[in-house]
């Protein structure tokens, strides 16, 4: 199990070009290549996972499939920290063996037969690595694409700052630095 600490900022699509040109991001080293991610989120028809603040997602990145389980996030001042479990998704079947919390795994196994796709996202992700000071490492991910549920569709455009190493306050400092130039956010 890992704990993800992140700050997500929803952006208007028109802000993307300026954000990419911001010196903080434009001069940062890239983490991998820009990729397209396809995600399907699952729940029961009664949305019981959502009710319990849990999520099950399958993600296709290139030719690789991953299954992710996330639990309720503790949100403090806009930062969210949540337990998550990730493992390969193979043979088009759910496998919750990586979930090391018995209560979560048992609940997922109970819901497993009734899990259905609820919505999908497809977006391009650009990732850079920010190291604002020694001992701090932040992934800055710009996502641009769509979210679809049934016949409905909406644009998805966000900046996600994920703390890999360091103090969570560094996420705020980076967001404030990006916001100083009003053209970028």
Describe each PLM feature range.
Residues 1-183:
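Phosphate-end processing signature that detects enzymes handling 5′-triphosphorylated RNA
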